């Protein structure tokens, strides 16, 4: 029977997949997250998208009205700082809202737990979140899982990037720790099927795949499936020595997320899924098969609204490119109108060229010409750009009037990138955000990005400020 469901953390990796699955089954979904634009563009049936910041959830009680089930998929691993405190505060806010507006049940996707004296910050945060949610006087089903094998799973992408980017793998000793990796498809089935088995009291289930594998065995299986042969030599390196800088040059996964995950891999994390399989039987997918389907799924990454479903971007994508995009940008507040900002942004490549640091843009173009890469020059005469237009070596791939203009990177570099100009009306003011997104091709692509970061931050800051200044002059 269709339910009215609130998904908290709907824009995340699991959230996006879960919302699609629930939509296909005819449930009425309220998808809530801080950033829901990408999900909204999918225009899924029976799905309404709502911006919610659970650090200040003023609108959460209203969203809880008439809700049957809440999925809690929120975590703060990628936020940096004291994410334990952040996760506790989010859980407290949700608990308080549920006390005010109760629902029939809450399903919380958590992590497998190590013994208390062996827990990492990530595992402690997950446990604290569960304990707080259980104080809401609502039946809580906590579903604990270890490594999830699926496109976009941070743990999987760290492993993938290490195999693709390093000629020799020298992981710390935790590589011998064992776990029970589960395919994304199996995990989603459990999450959805729990709707048909509502809880009347708190309960905890553990989800597992069909195999117990050490991380070393997972690396070996991945190399066999992908055809990437690498030496794997574990070394006695404490995980606390793994720096953010090191992670920045071996994986496209956000380094704070990657480090938090790795800190939790020091001990065996084995699931006992006996109770869950008795309640919800299904065929569990073998690790190798899950890896094959995941690598196939990753080929579709660029065929998305972020890239305007552009055929050229899709053709340029390579399996070795990092799944997660590195990004750098700058946001400016302005009194200028959206119309004025949009008009200025559309002048890119014209009289104002790139608004700031034009000598640096020219230098970058000369570097391409020096290696024999010919770049187009010029832009259309019309005032407003259209999808498919060329702006020098860039290609316009997304045009959302008074909201977003996205250009496909056309210069020579190890990876695939785009440059986005995003506008937003905040009521008393507007914002202009200038931001580059980069999917690196192996370690050369990661080093290229790190070398360009200082210039990017300097240029994008200047571009955003100059666009705002020109728009304010036009508005006045």
UniProtKB/Swiss-Prot annotation:
Signal peptide: none annotated. Gene3D superfamilies: NAD(P)-binding Rossmann-like Domain. GO terms for cellular component: plasma membrane. The keyword NADP does not apply. The chain crosses the membrane at residues 440-460. Keywords: Cell inner membrane, Cell membrane, Membrane, Transmembrane, Transmembrane helix. It is a single-pass membrane protein. Coiled coil: none annotated. It is found in: Cell inner membrane. The keyword Nuclease does not apply. InterPro entries: ComplexI_NDUFA9_subunit, DUF2867, NAD(P)-bd_dom, NAD(P)-bd_dom_sf. PANTHER family: NADH DEHYDROGENASE [UBIQUINONE] 1 ALPHA SUBCOMPLEX SUBUNIT 9, MITOCHONDRIAL, NADH-UBIQUINONE OXIDOREDUCTASE 39 KDA SUBUNIT-RELATED. This is Putative NAD(P)-binding protein YbjT.
